[in-house]
Amino acid sequence: WAREMKETFGAKNPRSWLMRFHTQTAGASLTAQQPEINVVRVALQALAGVLGGTQSLHTNSLDEALALPSAEAVTIALRTQQIIAEESGVTNTIDPLGGSFFVEAETNRIEAEAYDYFRRIEDLGGMLPAIEKGFFQSEISDAAYRYQREIDENKRRIIGVNAYNDEKEVKVPILKMDPEGYEKQKARLDEIRKTRDNEKVTKSLERLKNACEGTENTMPFILDSVREYATLGEIVNVMKDVFGEYEEPTWI
């Protein structure tokens, strides 16, 4: 980041050389089998993020491979962060792993691979052509496919999935949405539709459609529609009429 800011973009202010980033633990690594051990996975990933200098952190909950997280699971995820912050001592040093041969070697390897990606993107004509050609979607799907193949072929061991399996089913509390909450929200929405100025809503959505059909920034028009109490569905439908729906690109 610092090298690109200085050498490619000519940034003069040293503060702009600082890379600020957020970390979220890997939801894709959570397993429905033996879900309680997801706590360990999340703790290790969170610790890695803190050791790497993350400015903010989201820890996934242990039950997210099964459903939306329960209040109990969310609390454990929060306590994981608090233990790392206040009990582990890793936050007492700015860069605890600085100077480690392994970390420095990995840093150099990742940097080299990043520059290889930069080159490949430029060869495709830049970011927009790369998006249009499905390059990024292809890279992500290929990585996901390789990851799953490694698990299926036992080349990558996942505890509870293809290693140290436990026939005993462990049940964790699953969040169940209250049907009454749905009915209350539906009633609120019906009331808003009755009491809002529908003429203003229609006009705001028309302005949004015009912006979508042109080259203007659509965000101000989205916010105007929200202020007139247009629903999310109404706003999305306007944009869908203009832009269509996402279709996975074919990458050859």
Predicted regions and their residues:
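Gly/Pro-rich turn-and-neighbor structural signature
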Residues: 2-37, 119
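Structured alpha-helical segments in the cores of large, soluble enzyme domains
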Residues: 2-12, 40-53, 76-88
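A general structural signal for short secondary-structure junctions and capping/turn motifs
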Residues: 11-13, 48-50, 120, 149-152
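A structural signal for short secondary-structure junctions
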Residues: 14-16, 50-51, 215-218
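Active/binding-pocket-proximal capping segment
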Residues: 18-22, 75, 242-243
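Active-site-adjacent bridging/hinge elements
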Residues: 18-20, 53-56
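Short beta-alpha connecting loops at secondary-structure transitions
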Residues: 23-36, 42, 57-72, 89-107, ...
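Flexible, glycine-rich loop/tail regions that form catalytic "lids" or insertion modules at the edges
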Residues: 71, 79-82, 86-252
